[in-house]
Regions:
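Conserved loop-alpha-helix segment in the C-terminal half of the alpha/beta-hydrolase fold
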Residues: 240-278
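N-terminal cap/lid segment of alpha/beta-hydrolase-fold proteins
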Residues: 23-35
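Conserved HGGG/HGGXW glycine-rich cap/lid loop of the alpha/beta-hydrolase fold
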Residues: 34, 40-89
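Conserved alpha/beta-hydrolase catalytic His-Asp/Glu region
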Residues: 153-154, 158-160, 174-236
């Protein structure tokens, strides 16, 4: 009896250990000039790929990494876009059409098929640029993580856009010029805007991530992003892919209005601030799980 119990306990421990996948950190040469740093976890067959936003890195998705570590259904990937985090600081290519090509190369080199694709913030432009150039045949579902489909509108408080055309709040100029002229000020303001609870420790940690992106690259990717408009590309996915728009609380009404007009089948959830998936990871991950339950 004691031997049987011991064998049962050993079996349970081994089963648990085998079902848990630690985060693996790897590098991948995706073309002649770019080597991408990426992380992966989980033991499933369905790939999920999340793309970080402007100046950010894989570190922002650490709580999603933990969430999927024991998954037997999904394998979760995230990577540092060109010029960000630990990926190559290339001389050129710092615009979103090229980011879309980089994403294509990343998926191709790893052989990832029928991907659940998510983009946070300006990372939404990465995934939409990929879909514009290569189509959506390799995409199982699309998740916009507080990512707007275009940059400019009449009013960035009432429309699902990043900037007002007149830049009345000065945000476009700040993220371009303050990045060059006063990086510490920009970091503090940017990180503070992203957080519900901007403690000194959180601001310092996230500012360190921001600063992995050189100022000239950060300024260029902010300004090139200001010209992007992927509304037609996102709208064209209606009825073709499951869509999830997870946005910060103050973008809930604009995102729902846009979805009602263009993608009525989309699931829209709103809560917290720009880093809601990091600060309120349990709430975000629960919503993500519910959405994934509808994806086949």
């Amino acid at each position: 009896m004691a031997t049987h119990k011991l064998l049962t306990l050993v079996t349970l421990v081994l089963t648990s250990a085998l079902s848990w996948s630690p985060v693996r950190a790897e590098t991948l040469k995706v073309d002649d000039e770019l080597t991408v740093y990426y992380q992966v976890t989980g033991n499933g067959q369905i790939p999920i790929v999340f793309v970080p936003g402007w100046t950010m890195s894989t570190k922002v998705f650490d709580k999603q990494m933990a969430h999927f570590a024991q998954s037997t259904k999904y394998r979760f990937y995230t990577f540092d876009p060109r010029g960000q985090g630990m990926s190559t600081k290339t001389e050129g290519g710092h615009f979103y059409e090229q980011h879309g090509r980089d994403l294509h190369n990343f998926l191709s080199r790893l052989g990832l098929k029928h991907v659940v694709l998510g983009g946070w913030s300006y990372g939404g432009f990465d995934v939409l640029a990929y879909i514009r150039e290569y189509g959506a045949d390799n995409v199982r579902a699309l998740i916009m993580i507080d990512a707007a489909p275009k940059s400019l509108g009449a009013n960035n408080r009432t429309e699902w856009v990043w900037f007002s055309r007149d830049d009345a709040d000065g945000s476009r100029r700040a993220y371009t010029m303050d990045t060059l002229l006063n990086r510490k000020k920009m970091d503090k303001n940017f990180v503070g805007w992203m957080l519900e609870n901007p403690t000194l420790a959180k601001v310092a940690y996230l500012s360190t991530i921001c600063d992995q992106t050189p100022g000239t690259i950060a300024a260029l990717t902010n300004e090139t992003g200001a010209y992007e408009d992927y509304e037609p590309d996102l709208a064209a996915l209606e009825g073709k892919l499951p869509l999830l728009f997870s946005v910060r609380q103050d973008m809930g009404a604009p995102a729902r209005k846009w979805a009602a007009e263009h993608t009525p089948s989309a699931t829209v959830i709103s809560f917290g601030k720009h880093l809601n998936f990091w600060e309120r990871s349990d709430q975000f991950n629960a919503g993500l799980d519910r959405f994934l339950g509808t994806v086949h």
